[in-house]
Amino acid sequence: MGQIFSRSASPIPRPPRGLAAHHWLNFLQAAYRLEPGPSSYDFHQLKKFLKIALETPVWICPINYSLLASLLPKGYPGRVNEILHILIQTQAQIPSRPAPPPPSSSTHDPPDSDPQIPPPYVEPTAPQVLPVMHPHGAPPNHRPWQMKDLQAIKQEVSQAAPGSPQFMQTIRLAVQQFDPTAKDLQDLLQYLCSSLVASLHHQQLDSLISEAETRGITGYNPLAGPLRVQANNPQQQGLRREYQQLWLAAFAALPGSAKDPSWASILQGLEEPYHAFVERLNIALDNGLPEGTPKDPILRSLAYSNANKECQKLLQARGHTNSPLGDMLRACQAWTPKDKTKVLVVQPKKPPPNQPCFRCGKAGHWSRDCTQPRPPPGPCPLCQDPTHWKRDCPRLKPTIPEPEPEEDALLLDLPADIPHPKNLHRGGGLTSPPTLQQVLPNQDPTSILPVIPLDPARRPVIKAQIDTQTSHPKTIEALLDTGADMTVLPIALFSSNTPLKNTSVLGAGGQTQDHFKLTSLPVLIRLPFRTTPIVLTSCLVDTKNNWAIIGRDALQQCQGVLYLPEAKRPPVILPIQAPAVLGLEHLPRPPEISQFPLNPERLQALQHLVRKALEAGHIEPYTGPGNNPVFPVKKANGTWRFIHDLRATNSLTIDLSSSSPGPPDLSSLPTTLAHLQTIDLKDAFFQIPLPKQFQPYFAFTVPQQCNYGPGTRYAWRVLPQGFKNSPTLFEMQLAHILQPIRQAFPQCTILQYMDDILLASPSHADLQLLSEATMASLISHGLPVSENKTQQTPGTIKFLGQIISPNHLTYDAVPKVPIRSRWALPELQALLGEIQWVSKGTPTLRQPLHSLYCALQRHTDPRDQIYLNPSQVQSLVQLRQALSQNCRSRLVQTLPLLGAIMLTLTGTTTVVFQSKQQWPLVWLHAPLPHTSQCPWGQLLASAVLLLDKYTLQSYGLLCQTIHHNISTQTFNQFIQTSDHPSVPILLHHSHRFKNLGAQTGELWNTFLKTTAPLAPVKALMPVFTLSPVIINTAPCLFSDGSTSQAAYILWDKHILSQRSFPLPPPHKSAQRAELLGLLHGLSSARSWRCLNIFLDSKYLYHYLRTLALGTFQGRSSQAPFQALLPRLLSRKVVYLHHVRSHTNLPDPISRLNALTDALLITPVLQLSPADLHSFTHCGQTALTLQGATTTEASNILRSCHACRKNNPQHQMPQGHIRRGLLPNHIWQGDITHFKYKNTLYRLHVWVDTFSGAISATQKRKETSSEAISSLLQAIAYLGKPSYINTDNGPAYISQDFLNMCTSLAIRHTTHVPYNPTSSGLVERSNGILKTLLYKYFTDKPDLPMDNALSIALWTINHLNVLTNCHKTRWQLHHSPRLQPIPETHSLSNKQTHWYYFKLPGLNSRQWKGPQEALQEAAGAALIPVSASSAQWIPWRLLKRAACPRPVGGPADPKEKDHQHHG
C-alpha cells in the first residue's frame, strides 16, 4: 500500500522459457511506463503469470491482451494488472491490418485434404512493436552506460540484423530505460555495430537532424549550438528525447543486408605497410560501394578500425582516429614492423622451490614440470571416487573393450562350428581396418571377424601345416587367395596311393584338363593364428608342384578377414645422420629475394642443372615460403656450374665454431710414414641431409622463359654449397666417420681437411688395409670417392697445394717475381698474397716483405699505379732469390725441435728447425704491434708464446732450445730493471734461451742460404743509462705542456734557462706539447753528460723508461719527434722522477714544477675598476681592493647611472639579528618576489647569519618541493647548517619540508615575518640582491634572469667587502672557527666594553653583570653568561657599564656614566 519499489538492476530481464523475444519486449516496455517504476518483485510475478498463460490456448499471434487479462485472478500480487492495462490501451491505439479477403463460396462441400497437396501460402503476421513513449511528467532517468549494460544489450541483439524489428525493439527499450544523451548513443552505436553500419547510420542521422533543425524543434535554440551538442545536456529532457527519436529513425534507412560487404573485412597485415593497406581499401571501395554512397567517411572509419594494433596505437596517440586520411597516413608513414628475427631473449630459469610438489609430494621441481598427473580436487560427482577426475570416470566410458591387435601375430581360438557363418567377399577381398569398421558396425564380440595380418613385402603368404592322413604332416608356405573357390595343394604332400580324380579348372590362364586333380580324402590345415585345424573334405592337387593356395573354402571356416597393413613408404634416410645444430635454430623469418631474369642460354643451362640435381635427389619440389636467387656460371672447360646465392640466409645464420684450426702443417708428417695415399670425395656437401624445418631458407625458383608462366619452386634436401656453415658441418660429419678407422689403425695417420683425406702408413701392407677400411667406411656412409683422383706412393703426392717427397715438402705453385718499378695496385696485391701463401717455406727475413707492404699503404683508389723506390725493387730481387730456395723438411721424430727468433726494426722472424737437416721445418713472420713503442722484451715474449703454440699444435712438441739475437748483458739488464709484464714470461722460459749476441749471422746465414753477414740490430742496445738515485752534480730539467703551449725550466741552484712557446696551429695535442717541451729542454742541456729529469706526465715518464731498456719505434702521430729523443739522450746518465702536479707542497720540486706550469698559463687581462663596477656594480671597498683609490672608487659610484637610480646612498641600512657563532651555524631563509618582463619570479634566499654569505635560486612557485630544492642547492653551495630560521609560510611548515630537515639533522625554527629583530638579516639580504638585479636590468634589459642572479651572487659573496672585518662574505664564511673560550683568560690591552645583560627568553627584570663582551657585531654582542659558555645578546637586552678600574690604575676620563644604554 503505497510502497515504492526500486528499479531493476538488470537493463533487460530475461524472458520466461517459451515466450518469444518480441512479445517479452512489449511486456517490458509496458512495465517501464509504470510510475513509480517496476521492481524485481513485479517482474517475478509477471514471469509467473506468463508461464501459466503459455499453457492456455489463448496464446496466439497477435496476442489478445484483453483475453489475457481475463485470465488474471483477482488480487494477483504485483502490478501485473497495471501492465496488462497499458498493453490493452496501446493495442487499441495501433490500427489493425486489413483482413484477408474471404475464400470464394462454393456449393460443394470442401474436399478432404490431400496429403500430397501443400496448403495455400499465408503471409506471416509481423510481430507488433510498441513505440517508445515516456510517461507524462516522469522525472529524467538518465544514467551513463556501464560496460555490463552494453554487454547485456549486445547479447540480446547478437542474432538480429541492424534495423530488424527485434533489434529495434531492444534498442527502444534500452533508450527508454536509460534516457541516454547524444554521446551515450554514439558509444552504443560503436559498440553494437560494425564500422560500415556506424558510418551509414551517421550519414542518415546527419540528414535527419538537418531536416529537423530546418522545420524547428520544441526547445531547440540555434544560437546554443547544433542539436547534437544540446542533446548532451542531461537537463534538456525534451530536446534529448527528440534526438533519440531521430537516432532510432536513422536505422530505418539502413540496407536490409545484415552482413558487411567483402571490402569491410579487409584487414591490415602484421607487417603490411599502412599506405598499402589503405590503397587496398580504396580500390575495394571503388569497386564495391553502391553509387551515390559517400566513400570518404567509410574509408576513414575502416582505415582505423581494420588497421593492426600497432598502427591503431599510433593513431590513438596522435588523436587521428577519425581525422582526414592524409593525417592518418602521415601518422603511420614511419611505422615499420618490429624486427623479431635477430632478437634472442634467454631468460634464466628460476630455481625450484624448497616446498614439496602438490602433485607428487617431492621437492626439487615446479608443479608445472611435474610428470605426475594433477590430483582431482574432490570425489567424482558420478561415482564419488576421489581417485579420478569426472572426465576419467568409468561410467562415461564404453563398457565393451576393444581388443588391441598385436604386431607380430594374432591368435584367435574360435569354435569350428559357427551357427551363423558369414560369406566372404568374392574377388580376393583384402580389407583394411577403415573398411572393416564400415562393413561391420555395431556387432557384438562373438560376430566380429578375426583379422589375419599379412606381410605386404612378401604378398599374402602364410606358413601352414598340412596333414593329408596318407603321409606325415608337412609345413609349407601357402598363398591366401579369397578369389580361389577351392584350396590347391602340391602333389608332393600326398602319397602315391592317394586316389585322385580328373577335373577341369577355370583360371586366369583359361580352362585346364590335366594340370589339377581332385582328391576326396579329408585334409587337415593348421594355421598359426588358429588352434583348431581346418578340415577340408576335398581339395585340388597341383600335379606340377607349383601352387599352394588356401582358398575361400578354408578361409570360410576361419571366418576371418585378410588385413594387409597400409603400405607406409619408409623414410628416405641418408647414411649420414642429419646435423643437430645448423645455426638457424632460432628460426627467423626466411628471406624473400626475388629471382632476377636470365637470358635463354643461362636459363637452359639452369634448367639442365636443376634436372640433374632433381634426379640425384639433392633437391625436391617445394611450395613453402622463402626464396634465394640462383644462376649458372660457365667454367673454363665450357661446362656450367650451379650457383645458389645464399647471402641473405647467411646473414641470418649464427656462425658455428669449427673444431679445426685450419689446414694441417704437412711438415709434421714424420719421415717414418713413407707410404702415402690421397682420397678425394665427389660432391661431399651433398651427402648431409637437411632437416625439413630449414628448407624455407634454401628454397629457389626456376623462372619460365619470358615469364610465360609461374616459375617452378624447389628446395634443397641436402646441405648446399654456398651456405657458410656447410664446410663446418661436413667436416664434423666426416670426422665422425673416420674416428673408428683412426682407433683401429693407431700406427697410421689420417689427415683430413674439408673433403681431402691423406692416409700415411709405415708400410705398404698397412697402407692397403687402411685404404680398404677407409674406402669401405666412406662408401657405406654414402660418400662417393673419385677413383681417378686417388694418388699413392711410389709416385708424386700432391695434397693441399703442396708436393710431399720422402724427406721434404715443396709448394705446387711458387710465384714468379718480375723485377720492375711500376706496378698496378691489384698486381702487387695479388703477388704479395701468393708470397704469403708460400711464406712458411721461403727463407727470408721480415724486412723485404715489410718494404713491399709499405708500398701498398696510403692508397685509396684500387686503380692506382705504384712506383717502387730502389730499396723496394731490391726487396723484389731478394724475394725472387728466396723463392727459388723454397723448401721445407719433414719431421724427424728422433731429433728435438729447435727455434730461432730474429727481432728486427720491421718485425719478428721465427724459424723452427732440427739439427743436421738441410731445410727448416717452418718460417713464421709477425709484424710489429700497432703501438707507439714496442719494447724488445715484449716482442721476444710474444715470439716465444707464438712459437710454443705453433709447435704444440702442429708437432705436439716444444722447442728444446730457442736462439735469439739479444746479448746476454742487455737481456739481464732488462730482466733486472724493467717492470714490464713480459718479464715473468721471459724468466719462465729463460732455461731454453741461447743468446747469439754479436754472432747472429752464423746461424741465420745457414737458414738464408747466403754468405753475407747480418749486422746486429742497434735498437736492441740501450740508448742511455738510468740512474737509480738522483745525481747531485747534474742540473734538473722540468718540462710540461698543454694543448696550446710547451715549456721547460733548466735549474742548477738557480734557473739556467726557461722558455715557453706555442704549438704549431694544426696540432693541439697535450702529449705533443709535453714531448716538444722535453726536446727543447734536452737541447739546452746538450753539454751535460748527466741529467735529472722531473716530469709530471706519466706518458713521457714511461716512454723514457722503456726507451732506456731498448725498444722499437712503432706507428705514432708523434713519430718524427720521438725519433729525436735517442739522439739527444745518447750515452747520457739520466735520473727520472715523476712529479704529482698541483700538490702545493713546500718542497723545491713542487715549487719548480708549479713554476713550469705557470709558464703555460696565458695571462688574463685585468679588468679596470670602472669596467668591473659597470659589470658587477660592486661597492666602494671592493673597488679599492681591485686597485682603485678611495676617491676613484667614490667617483665611480657617483658617476654610475644605475647606482644613482636604484641605490643613491650606496649602502644598505644596518639591522639587528641574532647571529651564529661560526659558519653554517644558523641560517635564515625567505622567499621574496621579483617581477621582470611580466614574469613574477620567486627568489628563494638563504643567508648564513655568521658570514652573511647568500645562496639564491629563482623559481616560479612557492611550494614545499621548491623550498626543499632551494635548500639542497644552498647546502651544495655553502655547506650544511645546524639551524635554519624561516617565517611560518606554508612551504616551510609543510610536513615534507619538516621531514627533509629531520633527515638531514637540521633544526628548524620560525620567526615573525618582517620583524627587524628576528628577520632583519634575510630581509636586508633580499634588498641587496634585488637592488643589484635592478641595476643589471637597467644596464642590460635583455639579460637572462639566471645570468643576472649569478652575477649578483658573485658580487655579494666574492667582491663586496664587509666594513666591520674588511673581508668578503666568502672569506669570512671559510675563515677558521673561533678559539674555545678558556675558563681563565688574561686581559688584553685592547679597549674592552662592559655590559649589563638579560638572558633572552626570560621574563626576569633583574640585570646581570657587568660582563666584558668577547665580540661585538651589528645588533648584538657576545657575552660570557657563565664560566664555560657565551651567548649572543641583542642590544635591547644590554646596558653599557663602565669598566671597573684596576687596582692602582688611573680612571678613564671618557667613562663618565656608569649606567647608560648602548
From Swiss-Prot:
**Enzyme Commission designation:** 3.4.23.-, 2.7.7.49, 2.7.7.7, 3.1.26.4
Q: Which residues does the record give as Mg(2+) 2 binding sites?
A: D1040, E1074, D1096, D1157
Q: Which SUPFAM superfamilies does this one have?
A: Acid proteases (SSF50630), DNA-binding domain of retroviral integrase (SSF50122), DNA/RNA polymerases (SSF56672), Retroviral matrix proteins (SSF47836), Retrovirus capsid dimerization domain-like (SSF47353), Retrovirus capsid protein, N-terminal core domain (SSF47943), Retrovirus zinc finger-like domains (SSF57756), Ribonuclease H-like (SSF53098)
InterPro entries found in the cross-reference section: Aspartic_peptidase_AS, D_retro_matrix, DNA/RNA_pol_sf, Gag_p24_C, Integrase_C_dom_sf_retrovir, Integrase_C_retrovir, Integrase_cat-core, Integrase_Zn-bd_dom_N
Where is region (Disordered) located? 93-142
RNase H type-1 domain: residues covered:
1031-1165
User: What GO CC terms are in its UniProt record?
Assistant: viral nucleocapsid
Phosphoserine found at: S105
Q: Where is the active site?
A: D481
Catalytic activity as recorded in UniProt? Endonucleolytic cleavage to 5'-phosphomonoester; DNA(n) + a 2'-deoxyribonucleoside 5'-triphosphate = DNA(n+1) + diphosphate
**Keywords, in A-Z order:** Aspartyl protease, Capsid protein, DNA integration, DNA recombination, DNA-binding, Endonuclease, Eukaryotic host gene expression shutoff by virus, Eukaryotic host translation shutoff by virus, Host gene expression shutoff by virus, Host-virus interaction, Hydrolase, Lipoprotein, Magnesium, Metal-binding, Multifunctional enzyme, Myristate, Nuclease, Nucleotidyltransferase, Phosphoprotein, Protease, Repeat, RNA-directed DNA polymerase, Transferase, Viral genome integration, Viral nucleoprotein, Virion, Virus entry into host cell, Zinc, Zinc-finger
Locus of motif PTAP/PSAP motif: 124-127
* Binding-site residues, Mg(2+) 1: D680, D755, D756
Site, Cleavage: residue positions: L130, P131, L344, V345, L449, P450, L574, P575, L582, G583, M1021, P1022, L1167, S1168
Q: Where is the Integrase catalytic domain?
A: 1219-1388
Q: What cofactor is needed?
A: Mg(2+)
Motif PPXY motif: where?
A: 118-121
DNA-binding region(s) from the entry: 1393-1443
| Cofactor: binding details | The RT polymerase active site binds 2 magnesium ions. Binds 2 magnesium ions for ribonuclease H (RNase H) activity.
UniProt keyword Lipoprotein, yes or no: yes
**Which residues of this UniProt protein bind Mg(2+) 3?**
D1230, D1287
- Keyword Zinc-finger applies: yes
Output one GO BP term: symbiont-mediated suppression of host gene expression
**Written domain comment of the UniProt record:** Gag polyprotein: Late-budding domains (L domains) are short sequence motifs essential for viral particle release. They can occur individually or in close proximity within structural proteins. They interacts with sorting cellular proteins of the multivesicular body (MVB) pathway. Most of these proteins are class E vacuolar protein sorting factors belonging to ESCRT-I, ESCRT-II or ESCRT-III complexes. Matrix protein p19 contains two L domains: a PTAP/PSAP motif which interacts with the UEV domain of TSG101, and a PPXY motif which binds to the WW domains of the ubiquitin ligase NEDD4.
Misc. comment: Reverse transcriptase/ribonuclease H: The reverse transcriptase is an error-prone enzyme that lacks a proof-reading function. High mutations rate is a direct consequence of this characteristic. RT also displays frequent template switching leading to high recombination rate. Recombination mostly occurs between homologous regions of the two copackaged RNA genomes. If these two RNA molecules derive from different viral strains, reverse transcription will give rise to highly recombinated proviral DNAs. HTLV-1 lineages are divided in four clades, A (Cosmopolitan), B (Central African group), C (Melanesian group) and D (New Central African group).
- The protein in question is named Gag-Pro-Pol polyprotein
Q: Which organism is it from?
A: Human T-cell leukemia virus 1 (isolate Caribbea HS-35 subtype A) (HTLV-1)
The gene is: gag-pro-pol
